[in-house]
Amino acid sequence: MTMTDPIADMLSRVRNASNAYHDTVSMPSSNLKVHIAEILKQEGYIADFTVEDAKVGKTLTIELKYGSTRQRSLSGVRRVSSPGLRVYAKSTNLPQVLGGLGVAIISTSQGLLTDRQASEKGVGGEVLAYVW
């Protein structure tokens, strides 16, 4: 059975693994998921990620990040734009997550960017998710 929303599935897996204090989480890989993982690593929400090439398909393995007392780096994730309801934002009306403490992941014509990067470049796009 095919997945309707693979991005929501990825974010749910990462959130559930973080809430259960798992060290790693694996999922089927795609270019979009790898770019989202790059943004999460760049912003400090995950420790690392690897793409493993198998015979059947590629697997994305994300290593979760915790503080010294096992505090989660990833407090919450929310999927904004879905296949049934796309949400777009202009460059002048980009969302801020928790007053700038979180990150909005935006799909633009220049690739996947955070809300800060998109506002610096002056581009808008589809708001994929909020991470805090």
Swiss-Prot record:
The UniProt keyword set, sorted, is:
Ribonucleoprotein, Ribosomal protein, RNA-binding, rRNA-binding
Gene3D superfamilies in the record, alphabetically?
A: 3.30.1370.30, 3.30.1490.10
GO MF entries: rRNA binding; structural constituent of ribosome
A single Gene Ontology CC annotation of this entry is:
ribonucleoprotein complex
Write down what this protein is called: Small ribosomal subunit protein uS8
Q: Which organism is it from?
A: Corynebacterium kroppenstedtii (strain DSM 44385 / JCM 11950 / CIP 105744 / CCUG 35717)
Task: Tell me which InterPro entries the record gives.
Answer: Ribosomal_uS8, Ribosomal_uS8_sf
UniProt lists the family membership as follows: Belongs to the universal ribosomal protein uS8 family.
Q: Which SUPFAM superfamilies match?
A: Ribosomal protein S8 (SSF56047)
Functionally, this protein is described as follows:
One of the primary rRNA binding proteins, it binds directly to 16S rRNA central domain where it helps coordinate assembly of the platform of the 30S subunit.
**Is the Ribosomal protein keyword given for this protein?**
yes
Share an example GO biological-process annotation for this protein.
translation
Q: Which Pfam families match?
A: Ribosomal_S8 (PF00410)
Subunit structure of this chain's protein: Part of the 30S ribosomal subunit. Contacts proteins S5 and S12.
